Design a protein with these regions (language model features):
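SAM-dependent Rossmann-like transferase core, predominantly class I methyltransferases
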Residues: 15-87, 224-229
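Conserved SAM/SAH cofactor-binding pocket of Class I
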Residues: 59-135, 143-144, 150-151
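Catalytic beta-strand/loop module used to bind and position nucleotide/cofactor moieties
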Residues: 84, 142-148, 260-262, 267-270, ...
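Short loop/edge segments at beta-strand edges and connector loops
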Residues: 124-126, 246, 324-326
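Mobile active-site "lid"/loop adjacent to the S-adenosyl-L-methionine
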Residues: 144-174
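Conserved Class I SAM-dependent methyltransferase catalytic core
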Residues: 173-219
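N-terminal lobe of the biotin/lipoate ligase/transferase fold
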Residues: 211-309
């Protein structure tokens, strides 16, 4: 039910109204004690058809602890009984809460008054998919426990509960919210969504990344067959524009001159003297994506250079749907499609990250390479840059006040990406000997065995993989 329920006689047919009356009258309102922290809880009166606080509600509240900003303006979509809205209002946030279920709006208003925060909580009927509904322009934080049930639940839920709990049939509510965020240029807003992508691929967070939004996981919990994850999304640098050049010798050299504050990156339409690892020539053609990022060296206090490089590779590979060859090659169907380069300068306190991606497949010096038209389609270099910018920002952008992902998580993600190639039957050799790759260290080096000898491989010069 995508339209509002302000006039039930207009919004629901006779059978739906009868079902709603039967469903609502079969139960009474219930009182829930919802624990908002170790010391305090709030009492919530929850009418029939209104979503009560459950494990996912607690997980969402836990995830919001990873947003380290002063209270401002918060919007909650799908407020249900008002649990999240009231908890954040008690922290000092000014909350605008929306729900398509009018009983949820009434419940949120009543529960806010009981909690003593009705002066900071405004509850209104409406939400994503409603005609003429828009996100409040002053929102600092938008929160939504996304509907996760299959839309094929007719006659199981009441119509109003169905509207609140079931996903949109065609594209999914996540993508509809993304459209609103892009249309209304919410560049300075952080979106925090509780998503279930295991059984609902329409809620994939990669949809946001591929539209230029960085993401960071705040909390995760396995519930039955599903993984529920609280994810924060934001525009890299809160929408700040990269430096753009029509032509340059090297974006890595140009990156030395970028300001030493904020989210800084530079891209060029053409690069004449690009370089790869240890000064190797990086060949690029018109239309390729060539860019460099300049990040404060203090980020290395969190991630070692080796782990940072493979983590960036893993994040980019996840966004593009390609594979990673340790330590810095991006691979599509056994052919290189791009590469990553890291350089640091202790004198100016920065680390520079260079990324080059081929747009079209080709051949050079007898070696064939792939291009993104084969795995993403016909997008231009600026659109590709936005994806890469979002992927790198997910790790390194400190513009938003969001907790960084733990090193061990990136170590696990990177190892999982490396395994995609290793599991295809490739032959790995180190120092001329065939080896079995068994893990990735916290420093980003490979752990390997040959017979009874253990190796930790940190230099690619003595290492090779044959497809």
């Amino acid at each position: 039910m995508n339209k509002g329920l302000r006039n039930l006689g207009e919004k629901m047919g006779t059978s739906e109204i009868s079902r709603e009356v039967e469903y609502s009258s079969s139960e009474h309102s219930k009182v829930h004690d919802f624990k908002i922290n170790d010391m305090n809880s709030i009492k919530l009166i929850v009418p029939p058809t209104v979503y009560p606080p459950r494990r996912d509600t607690k997980l969402l509240l836990k995830g919001l602890e990873g947003i380290n900003m002063q209270p401002g303006n918060l919007v909650e979509i799908g407020c249900g009984s008002g649990a999240i809205s009231i908890a954040k209002a008690l922290e000092g946030w000014n909350v605008t809460a929306f729900d398509v279920n009018p009983l949820a709006v009434v419940a949120t208003k009543g529960n806010s008054e009981v909690a003593g925060v009705n002066d900071r909580v405004t509850a209104e009927e409406g939400g994503v998919g409603e005609e003429n509904w828009k996100l409040p322009a002053n929102a600092d934080l938008v929160v939504w426990n996304l509907p996760y049930l299959s839309p094929d639940l007719e006659n199981i839920l009441g119509p109003m509960e169905e509207a609140a709990l079931t996903d949109e049939r065609l594209r999914g509510w996540s993508e509809q919210l993304l459209d609103l965020a892009n249309e209304e240029s919410q560049n300075g807003t952080i979106f925090v969504l509780l998503m279930n992508s295991d059984s609902n691929p329409k809620n994939s967070p990669l949809t946001w990344v591929r539209k230029g939004w960085s993401k960071r996981s705040l909390a995760v919990e396995r519930v039955g067959d599903d993984t529920l994850e609280v994810i924060a999304f934001w525009r890299p640098g809160f929408g700040s524009e990269p430096t753009y050049l029509e032509k340059t010798n090297s974006t890595m050299d140009e990156a030395r001159n970028l300001p030493k504050f904020g989210w800084q990156r530079i891209r060029s339409a053409e690069q004449i003297s690009g370089r790869g690892r240890k000064g190797a020539i990086w060949h690029s053609n018109q239309g390729d994506m060539i860019a460099s990022w300049s990040v404060k060296l203090e980020e290395l206090n969190r991630l070692t250079p080796g782990l940072l490089q493979v983590s960036i590779g893993a994040s980019i590979c996840e966004a593009l749907g390609v594979q990673m060859k340790w330590p810095n090659d991006l691979i599509w169907q056994g052919r290189k499609c791009g590469g990553i380069l890291l350089e640091s300068s202790t004198y100016d306190g920065t680390i520079r990250i260079g990324v080059g991606l081929n747009k079209k497949a080709g051949e050079i010096e007898g070696f064939s390479y792939s291009g993104w038209t084969e795995y993403i389609g016909e997008i231009d270099s600026n659109e590709m840059f936005q994806i890469i910018d979002a992927a790198i920002g997910s790790i390194l952008d400190s513009t938003p006040p969001i907790d960084s992902t733990e090193n061990t998580i990136w170590q696990q993600k990177s190892w999982a990406k490396l395994c995609e190639i290793l599991s295809t039957g490739v032959v790995a050799k180190f120092d001329g000997r065939a080896v079995n790759i068994v893990g990735l260290s916290g420093a980003g080096s490979l752990r390997a065995y040959s017979d009874s000898t253990a190796y930790e491989i940190s230099d690619v010069d003595d290492f090779s993989i044959t497809f």
